């Protein structure tokens, strides 16, 4: 059972104000061993993880201060976190650590901690192991003591914390570096309460000088071996020192390696702990044991089973750091260009291109001083090479690969297209070509020197790294074929738009660990979904709310129409009294009668309504929380509201605001905010203020808020007196009178005030309204487009050479950033991240540039203008050709017209003769009709009597049929309207996607 996350947040807030006070105690490498065997319940294991999270928050975790690692063990080591200084990464990994199984084997946890210090520990930095567990089984005490003694010899200080009332105090004290470094706690809850004291415990053991007696023997820390620059691991390099330096710890270590060696023909071969790529050779020379450390060839591991070096993919080394390492790559110390890349949990050797070096956390970067060979050549492997210029190509050339590298351009490769033809291709941004893999599998970005530029880049077009118009599912239209993940197809793509339901998002893993450069531009078009989740699935509640609102409005209208009631207002109770008996409660819209009330407590109802209003305000505030549009960090948006990897880019949106958060590589954080209520108002300043400092409208009249009336100064007659305006409401305020403005076509009062424009309208909307007012008639297609544009917003973030600009529609905010944008390893995430609510709504387009596009438009209108110009010229040429044909046709038409007019005169003469004959025959017909009419009227009376009798019986059936037919008609109308809406959406989507396809094709052709 997991502990509620909210309690964790409160505990963290209370604890993390302590910290480490002394500067001497702020630098150390700490590994925590946690006993999570079958003796520990799932609930207690969750409490241990809570304590670890609290400790991560309380310590000064940083790459230059305290680095923390963690090991959980049962019968075997389960999960381990390498030493690192990333607080967010540690918190994320701790929360998702799994509980191991089996009986407790604490010596295995201690051994894993020793290997971690040997491979990743810093030089001249205190190494601390915190052993956290319960009672130790007697059979495991000896093995644990042996590992503890080895840790002391390697100058690792052990802090022991015993949990539970059954722990043996003597055993815990014997494990500790000295008795003062042993602590006892009742249970996991007691550990949580005392976790704030752990920084003091660490400071105490860091300052400890001399170890005391442990296990009946004195154990002195081994002397450190100077192995070169700071930051290198002393574990393996200490074994490489010459035999002249007879260090006791070195001899013990090498002796242990030879004890476990496999002997073949008088030579022993043994593996080296934590170094899968190394082995030791043991030989008996003149009665003494000679030890020689060897390294496997590039990209190979030592296989104890085969007693030889094999490819890393063929050997399952238990000490392979890729089994527990979170980063995708790490340093390989055989060359400045070499590094290990994690693939499917195994390490694979890779080389950076020439002129580049591997830098941990960044990948391959430009380094002209790195001129080492990669793979390095072993002794005796020197063959006759053709020339120095071809060395790099020969090293990275794979004869079984149809692709070849291009010298000086690691971001490109050649592909054989038939015969003797080779064509150049570009790798995906952020990757470099590897001949060994026959693919663009190297993480990094190639950078060219200014000296080698041939001037071609001056006219290079800034191309998007990602362009998602959502026309063909999640197809990237930038030409880079970027893969976009849609887990579970939770994001719905339809009609050229993507719908996010508030619990889904898109992920772009390609941008993980890729340097962004000095310029980044992101642009998105979106529309928020205004439906409330709680009311969306509660149709009955919606119907009740609508019904009550309609009843309240109708009742108030009926009351206002009654002139026999006198309105009174009681300001103290917030009620409007209609007469002596009736009371209207404005909040509920219901009429109350004092005589039937029976002593109703209006104050109590008012308080109840206030509480209801507060709840509604809380729901409204919750709905106004910012939602994430895009980020490049991995965050938890539902539990602790914390980021495991803090994003360096985050764009959020609210109903009236937009936020932009940017973090540089220099740890400079900049936050921009665009708030419609505070920034970016559009004021109409054409009419200045009047003498009283108030804004005048267009006509110079003083506006007022009284139901469409406005103040207008009275006109003067010839004698200087005010004219009487019929129908105007006079007023005795200095020659001004009230005048009601004429209603518009919709029955609404026109607004005469122009002091400032509506802050919800953008400048583009105002311009479009003015243009529509100048046009004649209405354009249905244009109205459809305007309806489709309602609610859509455009947000963009531009970072260029240290300058930041965030914009939403026509409002923007600017600032300055120190350094380049920080690289993250979470990729880009659309619709989620940054510890905010997931986005709920629609997205129309998404652009990501790693350059400065200059203009914010994705594809300029220049292409369309060119097409229009070409079409105009073609139309002119066609008109000239058609002109000659038109003249000949006109002559023929005039001749035919004369013949037609002659025939028309003959036709009119024939029609006059026909009318004469018709009048003569009409007289005879009327006589016959009068005679037959008498008989028909008699028969008609009989028919009416029968029909009346039948209508009495059929009236009920007709009403039922009418109701059914009306219901069917309404259903058909609704279905037709729905089909029309879907057809409109489909047409708009096709129009948009046709435009996108046409312009993208032109852009790719130009590129």
Curated annotation (Swiss-Prot):
Region span, Kex2-like proteinase cleavage site: 544-547
Alphabetical list of CDD domains matching this protein: vWFA
Domain Chitin-binding type-2: start-end pairs: 255-372
Tissues expressed in: Component of conchiolin, the organic matrix of nacre. Expressed at extremely high levels in the dorsal region of the mantle, which region may be responsible for the nacreous layer formation, but only in trace amounts at the mantle edge, which region may be responsible for the prismatic layer formation.
Ranges of compositional bias, category Basic and acidic residues: 588-625, 676-781, 877-973
Keyword Repeat: yes
Biased composition (Acidic residues): 380-396, 858-876
Segments of this protein annotated with the region Disordered: 212-244, 377-401, 588-634, 651-792, 854-983
Pfam families attached to this UniProt entry: VWA
Gene Ontology terms, MF aspect: chitin binding
One GO cellular component term noted in the UniProt record for this chain: extracellular region
Main localization (coarse): secreted
Domain VWFA: 29-202
Function, as annotated: Essential component of the organic matrix for normal growth of the nacreous layer. The complex contributes to the initiation of aragonite crystallization as well as subsequent stacking of aragonite tablets in the nacreous layer. Pif80 binds to both aragonite and calcite crystals, with a higher specificity to aragonite crystals.
Note: Pif80 and Pif97 are rich in Asp. This amino-acid appears to be common to biomineral-forming organisms.
Subunit structure: Heterooligomer; disulfide-linked. Pif97, Pif80, N16 and other proteins form a complex.
Protein name, UniProt field: Protein PIF
Upper lineage: Eukaryota, Metazoa, Spiralia, Lophotrochozoa, Mollusca
């Amino acid at each position: 059972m997991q502990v509620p996350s909210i309690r964790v947040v409160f505990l963290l807030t209370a604890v993390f104000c302590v910290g480490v006070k002394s500067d001497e105690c702020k630098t150390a490498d700490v590994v925590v061993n946690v006993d999570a065997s079958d003796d520990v319940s799932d609930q207690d294991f969750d409490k241990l993880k809570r304590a670890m999270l609290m400790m991560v928050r309380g310590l000064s975790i940083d790459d230059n201060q305290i680095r923390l690692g963690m090991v959980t063990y049962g019968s075997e080591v389960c999960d381990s976190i390498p030493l690192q200084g990333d607080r967010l990464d540690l918190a994320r990994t701790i929360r998702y650590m799994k509980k191991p199984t089996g009986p407790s084997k604490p010596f295995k946890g201690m051994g894993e901690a020793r290997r971690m210090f040997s491979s990743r520990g810093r030089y001249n930095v205190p190494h601390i192991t915190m052993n956290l567990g319960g009672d130790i089984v007697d059979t495991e005490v000896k093995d644990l003591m042996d590992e503890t003694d080895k840790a002391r010899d390697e100058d690792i200080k052990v802090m022991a914390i015993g949990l539970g009332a059954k722990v043996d105090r003597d055993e815990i004290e014997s494990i500790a570096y000295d008795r003062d470094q042993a602590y006892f706690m009742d249970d996991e809850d007691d550990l949580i309460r005392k976790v704030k004291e752990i920084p003091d415990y660490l400071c105490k053991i860091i300052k400890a000088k001399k170890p005391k007696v442990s296990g009946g023997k004195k154990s002195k820390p081994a002397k450190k071996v100077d192995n070169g620059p700071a930051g290198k691991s002393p574990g393996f390099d200490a074994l490489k020192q010459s035999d002249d330096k007879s260090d006791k710890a070195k001899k013990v270590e090498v002796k242990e390696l030879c004890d476990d060696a496999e002997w073949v023909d008088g030579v022993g071969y043994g593996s080296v702990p934590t170094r899968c790529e190394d082995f030791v050779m043991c030989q008996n020379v003149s009665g003494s044991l000679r030890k020689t450390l060897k390294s496997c060839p590039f990209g190979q591991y030592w296989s104890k089973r085969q007693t030889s070096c094999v490819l890393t993919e063929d050997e399952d080394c238990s000490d392979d750091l890729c089994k527990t390492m979170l980063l995708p790559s790490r340093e390989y110390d055989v060359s400045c260009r070499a590094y290990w890349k994690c693939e499917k949990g195994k390490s694979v050797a890779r080389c950076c291109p020439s002129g580049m070096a591997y830098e941990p956390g960044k990948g391959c970067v430009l380094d002209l001083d790195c001129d080492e060979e990669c793979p390095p050549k072993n002794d005796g492997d020197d063959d006759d090479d053709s020339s120095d210029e071809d060395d790099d190509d020969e090293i990275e050339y794979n004869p079984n690969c149809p692709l070849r590298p291009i010298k000086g351009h690691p971001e490109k490769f050649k592909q054989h297209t038939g015969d003797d033809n080779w064509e150049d291709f570009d790798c995906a941004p952020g990757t470099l070509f590897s001949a060994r893999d026959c693919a663009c599998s190297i993480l990094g970005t190639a950078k060219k020197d200014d000296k080698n530029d041939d001037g071609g880049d001056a006219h290079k077009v800034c191309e998007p790294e990602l362009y998602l118009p959502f026309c063909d599912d999640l197809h990237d239209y930038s030409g880079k074929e970027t893969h976009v993940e849609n887990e579970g197809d939770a994001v719905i793509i339809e009609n050229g738009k993507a719908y996010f339901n508030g619990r889904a998002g898109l992920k772009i893993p390609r941008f993980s660990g890729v340097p962004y450069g000095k310029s980044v531009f992101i642009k998105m078009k979106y529309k928020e979904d205004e439906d409330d989740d709680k009311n969306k699935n509660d149709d009955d509640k919606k119907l009740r709310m609508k019904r009550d609102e309609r009843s309240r409005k109708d009742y108030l209208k009926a009351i206002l129409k009654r002139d026999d009631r006198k309105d009174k207002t009681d300001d103290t109770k917030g009620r409007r009294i209609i007469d002596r008996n009736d009371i209207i409660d404005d909040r509920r819209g219901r009429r109350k009668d004092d005589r039937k009330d029976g002593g109703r407590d209006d104050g109590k109802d008012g308080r109840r309504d206030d509480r209801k209003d507060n709840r509604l305000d809380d729901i409204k505030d919750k709905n106004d929380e910012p939602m994430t549009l895009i980020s490049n960090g991995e965050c938890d948006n539902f539990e602790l509201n914390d980021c495991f990897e803090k994003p360096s880019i985050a764009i959020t949106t609210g109903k009236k605001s937009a936020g932009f958060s940017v973090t540089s590589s220099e740890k400079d954080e900049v936050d921009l905010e665009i708030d419609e209520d505070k920034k970016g108002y559009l004021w109409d300043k054409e009419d200045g203020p009047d003498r009283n400092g108030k804004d005048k409208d267009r006509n110079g009249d003083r506006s007022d808020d009284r139901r469409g009336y406005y103040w207008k100064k009275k006109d003067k007659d010839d004698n200087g007196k005010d004219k009487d305006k019929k129908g105007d409401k006079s007023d005795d305020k200095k020659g001004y009178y009230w005048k009601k403005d004429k209603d518009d076509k919709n029955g609404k009062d026109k607004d005469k005030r122009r002091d400032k424009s509506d802050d919800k309208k953008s400048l583009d909307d105002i311009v479009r309204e003015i243009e529509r007012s100048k046009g004649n008639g209405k354009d249905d297609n244009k109205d459809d487009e305007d309806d489709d544009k309602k609610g859509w917003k455009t947000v963009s973030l531009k970072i260029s050479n240290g300058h930041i600009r965030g914009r939403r529609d026509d409002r923007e905010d600017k600032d300055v950033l120190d350094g380049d944008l920080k690289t993250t390893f979470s990729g880009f995430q659309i619709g989620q991240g940054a510890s905010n609510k997931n986005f709920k709504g629609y997205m129309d387009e998404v652009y990501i540039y790693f350059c400065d596009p200059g203009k914010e438009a994705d594809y300029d209108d220049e292409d369309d203008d060119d097409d229009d110009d070409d079409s105009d010229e073609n139309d002119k040429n066609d008109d000239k050709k058609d002109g000659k044909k038109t003249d000949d046709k006109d002559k023929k038409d005039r001749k035919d017209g004369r013949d037609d007019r002659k025939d028309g005169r003959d036709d009119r003469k024939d029609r006059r003769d026909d009318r004469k004959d018709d009048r003569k025959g009409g007289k005879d017909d009327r006589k016959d009709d009068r005679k037959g009419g008498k008989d028909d009227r008699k028969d008609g009376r009989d028919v009416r009597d029968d029909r009346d009798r039948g209508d009495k019986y059929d009236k009920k059936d007709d009403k039922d049929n009418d109701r059914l037919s009306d219901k069917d008609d309404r259903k058909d109308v609704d279905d037709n309207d729905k089909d029309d809406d879907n057809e409109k959406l489909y047409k708009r989507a096709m129009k948009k996607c046709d435009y996108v396809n046409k312009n993208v094709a032109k852009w790719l052709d130009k590129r």
